[in-house]
Amino acid sequence: MLRTKHLLTFLLLFSSLFAWSQKKTATVSGKVVDENDQPLARVSVIMLGKQSGITTSDSGRFTFKVPADKAFALVFSYAGYKTVQRNFFLSENEEETIIIRLDKGTRTLDEVVVTTQPERTEMGLIRINPKNALIIPSTIGGIESLIKIFVGSNNELTSQYSVRGGNYDENLIYVNDFEVFRPYLVRSGQQEGLSFINPELTGRVSFYNGGFQSRYGDKMSSALDIQYKKPKKFGGSAYLSLLEQGFHVEGTGAKDKFTYLVGLRQRTNRNLLSSQETTGSYIPSSTDIQAQFTWQFNPKWQLEALTNFARTSFTLVPEFSQLTTSVFSPLFSANIGVDIFFEGKEKDRYATNMVGLAATQQVNKNLRLKWMFSRFENDESENYDIIGAYLFGERDFDRSKPTFGEIVNPLGAGLYQQFARNQLNIVNWAAAHKGQLIKQKQVMQWGLTLEKTLINDQLNEWERQDSAGYTLPYLPGRLSLSKVIKSTADLDINKISGYIQDNIVFNDSLGITLQAGLRFNYNALNQELLLSPRLQFSWMPRSKKDLVFKAAAGAYHQPPFYRELRRLDGTVNTALLAQRSWQVVAGMDYQFKVGNRPFRLSTEAYYKQMTNVVPYDIDNVRIRYFGENNAKAYATGVEMRLVGEWVKDAESWLSIGFMRTRENLDDDFYYNFYNKDGELITGQTEDQVVADSARVDVGWLRRPTDRLFTMGLFFQDYLSTNKNFKVHLNLLFGSNMPYNIPGSVKYRNALIIDPYIRADLGFSALLLDNEKGNRRSHSPFRNLENIWASLEIFNLLDRRNTISFLLIKDYSNTTFAVPNRLTPRLLNIKLLARF
C-alpha cells in the first residue's frame, strides 16, 4: 500500500513537470518611444500580477515570452512618464509586434494607446529617426542625407534628390502640414545653402517614395512629411563644425499651455569648395532662423505659428581651372586636358521668408478640425559675367619630363563669355482646411486648399563662344551668340485643390486595411481640372503577423509651375498642361530576428506610365524644360530595404534598387546623309558631297535620371567594451547616368556619366554623459546633458565623381566632353552639446 502511494505521488509529480515543460507560449516584441517618437531605453516591462520583468534596450526595443491561449497584460513604466497597460490574447507560437508611446506625466496605469505600424502597412512609407541626421557623416547633413540612403544620389553638394526616375521638381515637402519650396535659380550644388528642415527641431519624419495617399499633394514622385517637436520641458543644443554651426532652445510656459522651439543655423561650404578643380575665391554663406510657437488655450483649441527666415549668398571670383580626361578610340587615344584662365565674378543671392499659422479644434475625441494660413516667398538674384580663355589638347603625365602636367599637343584654343542678370520673386499665399473623423474602425480625412501664386522674373542671360578667332556659330559679317535668354514674366496663378480619404481597418482576424481617396486640382492659369483617385491595400495574415502584403494604385498628376512653363528660349507657355501619371506599386514587409536582434525587410515593385510629359535636361542641379507637352515616358523598378540591428542596439540600413526610365519625344528624328558611293558621311569621310539621305526616328531613349542600379548603406557600430565610442559609415553607389548634348536630336542623352561611388566615415565619442549627479556644484558643465565630439572623413575612397561635362570643339570641329568633377577627400570635426 505504501509503495502504491509513493508510485502515485511520483506519477503526479512527473505529469506536472511534463505539463510544465509543454507550456504553450507566444512572443510580444516591439519598441517603446516618447511623444516625439524617440526610443526610450531602460523602460520597465512587467506582466501584470508578476514581480519581475525586463527592460528595453538602448534602442527602446524589447522581446517578452508570454503565455498563450490566455488573457494577460503588460505594464510599461518609466520615471517621469505615465505608466500604461496593454492587454493581449495570443495563440500558441504567435508573435505580436507593437509600438508603445509613453507621454510625460505622473498619472499611473492608463490604458495605453498603441500606435499602429503604418511603415509596415502603408505603401512607400519610410520612417526615419531624425537623430541620425546629426550623426550621419555627410557633406550636407540634415534629413535629406538620410533620404539619399534609400533613393540614391549623384551629388554630395546638394540636398535635392531624385526618386524613382523623377527629377528634383517632382518631390513634395511639408513641415507641420505647410508646404515648403526650394530656390529655383540655383544652377549647381555649390550655390545651395541650408535646407529648410532643421534636424534639431524635427520630431517625426515620414518619407513616401511613391504610391502616397490622397491627402498629399499633386506631384509625381515623392512626399516628405516633417513634424517638428512638441517640447515638454526646457532644453536645447549647440554644435560647431568646420562646415556648420547651430543653436536651438525649446521649452514651455504658462503652466505648459505655451511651448516654444527656436533654431539658428549658419553654414559655409568654403572648406568643401576650396578643393574644387576651379581655383579662386569662394565666399559661400547661408544663415537661417526658425521658430515654432504653440498656445493651448483650452483642451479643445490650439494655435500654432511657424516662421522661417533664410539668407544665402554665393560669391565666386574664379582664377584657373585644370580639367583632364582620357580618350580611347580606334583613331585617337590620349590624356586630354583643358586649361582655363578666368576673368570676372559671380554673385548670387537667395532669400526665403515663410510664416504659417494654424488653429486646431479638437471638437471631441473623434473629430479634429484644422485651419491653416501661410505665406511663402522666394526672392532670388543671379549675377555673373565671366570670361574664360582656354587651351585644349593632350596633357603630359610623364613625371620625368619638365612638361609634366602641361598641354604639349594643342588641339584647340578659344574664349567664351557667360553673362547673366536674372531676378526672380515668387510669393505663394495659401489658406487650407483639414479634418479628421474617427468612427469605429474608420478614419475619414478631408481637406481643401486655396492658393495664389505671384511670379515676377526678369531673365537676361547669354553666352558667347570664340574659337580660333571666329565667333560660334560663325556667320560672316555678324556677331552672334551661342545662347540667348532674354525674357520677363509677371504671372498670377490661382489654384484650388482638395481631397477626401477613407482609412478602413477590417476585422482583426482578417488583417486587412484599405485606404481609398480622391484628389482634385483646378489651375486657373491653363483652366485645367485634374482628378486623381488613389487606392492602397494591405493584408497581414492572422497566422503570420510578421508578414504584410500591400499594394497601391492611382493617378499622380503634376500641374506646371515656374520652371516647367519656360521654354528653352525663355518664353513662357501659359497653356502648358499638367504632366499625368498612373502608378501601380506592390510589395511586402517581413519582420524577423537574427540572433535575437530585430530586422525588417521591405520589397516594392513599381510601374509608372506618364503622358503629357515635359522633357528636360539636367546640368548639375539646374533643370531646363522644353516647355511643351511633347513626350511620353515610363519608369519601372524594384526596391529592397533591410533595416535592423546588425550590431545590438545600433540600427543600420541597407537599400538596393533596380530601375529603368525611358521617354519618347514627339517628332524627334534626324537624317543620315550619304555620298554617291553609299557611304555614311561623317567627319572622317573623304567624299562629303550629299547624294542621298534617310530619316531616322529616335524612338525610346534614356531619361536624364535613368540609373539601372543604386545601393545605399548606413552602418553603425561601437566598441564592445564602451558604447560611448561609435563609428558611422555612409556608403552610396549608383550606376552610370546619361548626359545630354544640347541641341542634338541624334545624340540626346548619349553621353555617359561614370558610376557614382562615395563612402563617408564618421567617428564619435561621448565626452560628457548625462549623469549630472556625479558633477560638482561649481562645474561649468553641471547643466549640460551630454557632449559629443565627432571626426568625419568625407569621400574616404578619394574618388572624384563626375557631375557634368564641358563640351569643347577642336580645330577640326570635333566635340570632346571633358568631365566636371566633385569634391575629393576632406576632413571635418564637430562638437555637439545638449542641455
Model-derived features with residue positions:
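Face-selective signature of the C-terminal outer-membrane beta-barrel domain
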Residues: 296-311, 344-526, 602, 653
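Short, acidic, small-residue-rich periplasmic hinge/interaction motif at the N-terminus
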Residues: 31-38, 44-48, 75-82, 91-135, ...
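Surface-exposed extracellular loop regions of Gram-negative outer-membrane beta-barrel proteins
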Residues: 529, 542-585, 605-630, 730-744, ...
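C-terminal beta-signal and adjacent terminal beta-strands/loops
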Residues: 732-742, 765-835
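Gram-negative outer-membrane beta-barrel transporters
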Residues: 507-509, 607-609, 629-740, 832
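Transmembrane beta-barrel wall of Gram-negative outer-membrane proteins
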Residues: 237, 243-266, 279-319, 346-371
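Membrane-embedded beta-barrel scaffold of Gram-negative outer-membrane proteins
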Residues: 370-374, 578-651, 657, 663, ...
